[in-house]
A protein has these predicted regions:
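Active-site-proximal helices and loops of the catalytic beta/alpha 8
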Residues: 21-109
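Active-site groove signature of glycoside hydrolases
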Residues: 1-25
Length: 109
């Protein structure tokens, strides 16, 4: 994964990578991958979905998941809690309002 993304960044001059289900990867690999990419392009963007679709063999502090975000080095994650507080509706087929849609009960982002 590290070699592949480095190749694509060099060869195709890609400016960023987005990882679906990033929590299926371990933090160490994601940190190494990001560090390698930053040597190629210090402004490269790396981010992903910090969830695992309901299961992973990685346990505790090893997975690149939302609750371990403080250990991410140089890359980011989606924040579904902030998203839901801001826009709410549409994510689960509900018509609930979020903060942006003038909800008075939505948590502040």
């Amino acid at each position: 994964m590290i070699d592949s993304t480095a190749f694509w960044a060099k060869e195709y001059k890609l400016g960023g990578f987005r990882f679906d289900l990033m929590a299926l990867h371990d933090i160490e690999t994601m940190n190494l991958l990001t560090a390698k990419l930053k040597t190629i392009n210090e402004g490269i963007v790396v981010y992903g979905e910090p969830w695992d679709a309901g299961g992973s063999s990685l346990t505790g502090n090893f997975a690149a998941k939302q609750t371990n975000g403080n250990r991410f080095e140089g890359y980011g994650q989606f924040n579904d809690q902030a998203r839901d507080a801001l826009i709410k509706s549409g994510m689960n087929g509900k018509a609930d309002k979020g903060w942006v849609n003038n909800s008075t009960s939505a948590a502040s982002p």
